[in-house]
Regions:
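Intrinsic-disorder/coil detector with helix-boundary
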Residues: 2-346, 353-373
Length: 373
């Protein structure tokens, strides 16, 4: 199965050990690691514990980096490390009769941990971290995603709900590894299972936006240096593999597919991009931007605006933190249109190879926003 933001919902297998995520030196920026709260679990059908903030993540790569930043930052973390997963608590409360998922490795609704964080104002906030296995583009579709969002808000009593994870770039200025933070979104649906939801073409915009005061410090001192994994030899190897699996790519060169947001010379320092009020685009299909057609969106992803819609109904503040795991892909080479299947494969390959590292940046950016509360 080709892996991308749409398909990466299954537990991944051991694939060897490439470069790990580093131990996080919180003291370097004058802070300490989040503290894990134990003894809060009464079984998968019990209500969720109370929390000030809920932070949701989605894919396997995102979840791995999420745990590393918020739970286990004192050791290195490889993409195929899995021992940490068993400490997460399953949550399956109030699943309607007949509601199911297409993913036997990740049953509804998902898994969680509870942590406490010290903020810059010397307050302590309690955060429920949630690995959501309920997706807009997979059964139980919009109805399931709306229900779990409502339960997360109602049971925790949170004042903020965040959704964080990987995203497609909407413009060439969004480099691989950058993180876009927004409080607005627009929903665009195609699946018949979702069209009856009444959510198609709905837009949301939050009234609150997080403080940005720690962003520059965190990106400078803690972000992953993408040039340590995105090199021309690595890109050449990926391109050779692309040509092997897609004969249409044989007419292309590597330079045809490496545009500015993927060029290693532009990736030394990833950045956090605040986008207060600029909507991301939420779809129930895998969408890769072409040219300037998607520039009006902050990023492209597949769940968030539904989270925001439910939160808005419940008068709960919401925010989205999306790391660029697959930048905008060139649409033409030497004046000729590049086939969509080639662009899709290349986008998926970039996500598969680098999404773990971009997700680390995304989780750190979220930590920075929460700590500045």
């Amino acid at each position: 199965m080709e892996k991308n933001r749409f398909t990466d919902t299954f537990r991944t297998q051991n694939t060897g050990k490439p470069l790990p995520l580093p131990i996080i030196d919180w003291e370097r920026i004058g802070y300490t690691a989040p503290t894990v709260i134990s003894g809060e679990y009464d079984g998968s059908s019990a209500p969720l514990p109370k929390a000030d903030v809920v932070v949701i993540t989605w894919t396997s790569a995102e979840w791995n980096a999420f745990d590393h930043v918020f739970v286990n930052s004192s050791s290195t973390r490889y993409p195929d490390d899995r021992d940490w997963e068993h400490a997460w608590h399953t949550y399956s409360r109030n699943i309607p009769s007949g509601m199911s998922t297409d993913n036997t490795s990740a049953p509804l609704w998902g898994l969680y941990r509870v942590i406490e964080m010290k903020t810059s104002k010397k307050k302590t906030i309690r955060v429920l971290l949630f690995k959501c296995d309920t997706h807009l583009a997979h059964p139980p579709y919009a109805s399931g995603l709306e229900q779990i969002t409502g339960q997360l808000i109602d049971e925790t009593g949170c004042s903020w709900i965040w959704s964080i994870g990987t995203a497609g770039g909407s413009k060439e200025s969004e480099n691989l590894g950058d993180v876009v933070i927004t409080n607005a979104g627009h929903i665009q649906l195609k699946l018949s299972e979702n069209l009856s939801s009444g959510l198609n073409n709905k837009s949301v915009k939050g009234t609150a936006f997080p403080s940005t005061k720690l962003f520059s410090t965190v990106q400078k001192h803690l972000f992953f240096d993408m040039t340590s994994v995105v090199t021309w030899p690595v890109l050449k190897s990926m391109f050779d593999e692309l040509q092997q699996k897609d004969s249409g790519a044989k007419s292309l060169t590597l330079n045809d597919l490496v545009n500015p947001p993927l060029d290693p010379k532009n990736l030394k320092q990833s950045k956090i991009v605040p986008a207060d009020g600029k909507p991301l685009l939420t779809t129930d299909y895998y969408y890769i931007a072409s040219g300037a057609e998607a520039a009006k969106w902050s990023v492209l992803e597949m769940d968030d605006a539904v989270i925001g819609y439910v939160a808005q109904q419940k008068k709960t503040s919401f925010c989205f933190s999306r790391n660029i795991s697959d930048p905008i892909v060139p649409a033409k080479a030497k004046g000729k249109t590049i086939d969509d299947s080639i662009r899709g494969d290349w986008s998926g390959d970039i996500y598969s190879r680098f999404g773990f590292y971009t997700s680390f940046n995304g989780a750190l950016a979220t930590w920075a926003a929460l700590t500045a509360m």
